[in-house]
Amino acid sequence: MSFRKVTIIIWALAVILFLLALHHNFLSLSSLLRNDVSDSGIVGLQPIDFTANFHQHPVNERQEEIPVVIAASEDRLGGTIAAINSIHQNTRSNVIFYIVTFNRTADHLRSWLNSGSLKSIRYKIVNFDTKLLEGKVKEDPDQGESMKPLTFARFYLPILVPSAKKAIYMDDDVIVQGDILALYNTPLKPGHAAAFSEDCDSASTKVMIRGAGNQYNYIGYLDYKKERIRKLSMKASTCSFNPGVFVANLTEWKRQNVTNQLEKWMKLNVEEGLYSRTLAGSITTPPLLIVFYQQHSTIDPMWNVRHLGSSAGKRYSPQFVKAAKLLHWNGHFKPWGRAASYADVWEKWYIPDPTGKFSLIRRHMDTSNIK
């Protein structure tokens, strides 16, 4: 074989190896978030665009699908179920739930969804691989409640819902009292990848709220003593927003590489400690505040009536709570716990666990009987 032919073969092999490496890097992120289950069991290493068997109920197929992404943690599974049930019972729209969880929780979740009134919902269970967070999150004992991996699922919406142009994300400690279609139809301004409810958009403009609570701003989440934060020229007094409920334009999200931007700031925080030492809320909030600074639309404040979990007392009137489109128990006092504001409103949407693994904790209950 001539030297020229050998050279050509070597170059051809080099090109093939380069293309294989490029293909592997392109798929690596998607492979970390694998769809979990159909009725037959774990899907395992199926690609992210694998479609599990949806549980069908009669819908108008001409209606646009409304993807709703929600996390399902084992110790908060009752919250996820109640949120899903409240959405399902209050709409006739074509909703598909993308439920993000771990493989170890999938069977428990599936048995709950297959019981009672939830049998007719359409859903897909997606496994969240914690390897996705390596090098992006550091353990902090003071933020233990916020460090749970599933709370970061909201950063990866285009991967969780790969074929959708738009999606809704919501936390598991919410109840929806309005038609989810209205939230989905929230108008987003050109160039905006998401719409949030701002912490200063006080719903008290519509009704007087007793004990309106703290108004948060950027300085409550970011360390303005750090040069990297100061260089961003973000006003410390800028009103923050709540990322527990938002509408995302996934086409714009992908165009702006929002996920990559969020991961960048997560890594920089691990290296430099950019978040406030007295963090006002979830650890997921600071990178979102940076990436979406003055670049987000707003949702109707009645679609995120929050702080119901900030204390056991009732900060809102019964009339206001009834009028709210979405109730959010963000804070330490969850409605499935021993004491929470308007727990009775939440409990109307709760479906008891058929396996008996999850139980509500109530003041009148003997703690020895709690599973």
Curated annotation (Swiss-Prot):
Please tell me where this protein is predominantly located: membrane
Q: Which residues lie on this side of the membrane: Cytoplasmic?
A: 1-5
Q: Which UniProt keywords apply?
A: Glycoprotein, Glycosyltransferase, Membrane, Signal-anchor, Transferase, Transmembrane, Transmembrane helix
Q: How does this protein sit in the membrane? A: Single-pass type II membrane protein
Please name the top-level EC class of this enzyme. transferase
Q: Which residues are glycosylated?
A: N257
Q: Does the keyword Repressor apply?
A: no
- Could you tell me what this protein is called? Glycosyltransferase 8 domain-containing protein 1
| Naturally occurring in which organism (per UniProt) | Rattus norvegicus (Rat)
